[in-house]
Structures are given as structure tokens and as C-alpha cells.
Amino acid sequence: MARRLILMLVLCCMVSNTTYASEQLAMNEKQKGIEKLQEIEYEKDLYLLSHLINAEAGSDWCSDDLMRYVGSVALNRVQHQAFPDSLEEVIYQSGQYACIWDGNFDKEPCERAVRIAKELLEGGSVLPVDVVFQAEFIQGSGCYIQEQNTYLCTY
């Protein structure tokens, strides 16, 4: 009787371990899938943000700070309730970025724009979250900072 009980316990443990191992394998595969999607999303956002930064502030005379501010405004818009929820939707939102319709967005970004886009995607916006406008004139509720000929303004 004791032998049977021990044998049943051993079998239950084996089945339990097999089930646990199967669940772990499934969880690992799911995690790999999530990581792959995050990698794809990062690459897509890097492409979009580096092209936007280059098109809006990629001239040699533009400072690195201005490039960071341009990218930060786009990232802040993703977080703000008045704008779309993805970087792609923010950039392609009708009437927001002239570089979309004038063709400048499609130009290959310079190395500085790519480097700064990576910095921003990995470290986040360098501006307060309510700074969601950039233009050569003041918009929204006021100017947070002016960099060169660009005003960075709050909602």
C-alpha cells in the first residue's frame, strides 16, 4: 500500500513537472514573441523619429538641442490626450508636419538625427510633457523655450 502511494506521488510529480515545463516553454516562447514585436516597434519608431528630426531640424546650422526638442515634441504628443497614441499617427496627422507633404521626410537622415532619435527613444523626452508644439511662431498657451528660430510651446 505504501509502495503504491509512493509510486502515485512520484507519477503525480512527474506529470506536474512535465506540465510545469510545458507552461514554462510556452511562456518563454510568448516572451520571445513580445520581445521581437518590441524590437520591430523600436526599429519602426527609430526610422520615423530620425526622419522627422532630420526633416525638421537636420540642417548643419541646427543645434543638437533643437534636434532633441523636435523629437521630444513628437514623443510628448504621443503621451498627450489631444494627439494620436502612436509616433506614426502623430507624425502623419493631417496638417501637423510640413515635411510630410513637402517630401523632406523621405530624405535619408543624417547620423546626428539617428543618434539623437536613439537617445530619445531610450531615454525619453527632454522637455516637460505639456510641450507639444514647435514652430517659428508661438502657439498654444505659451512659449516654454526658444531655440534658434523655433518656439517650443505648451498645450
Task: Go through each PLM region and give its residues.
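Sec-dependent N-terminal signal peptides of Gram-positive bacterial secreted proteins and lipoproteins
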Residues: 2-21
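Intrinsically disordered, low-complexity sequence elements enriched in Ser/Thr/Gly/Pro
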Residues: 1-2, 36
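Bacterial extracytoplasmic/cell-wall-associated proteins, especially those involved in peptidoglycan
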Residues: 25-155
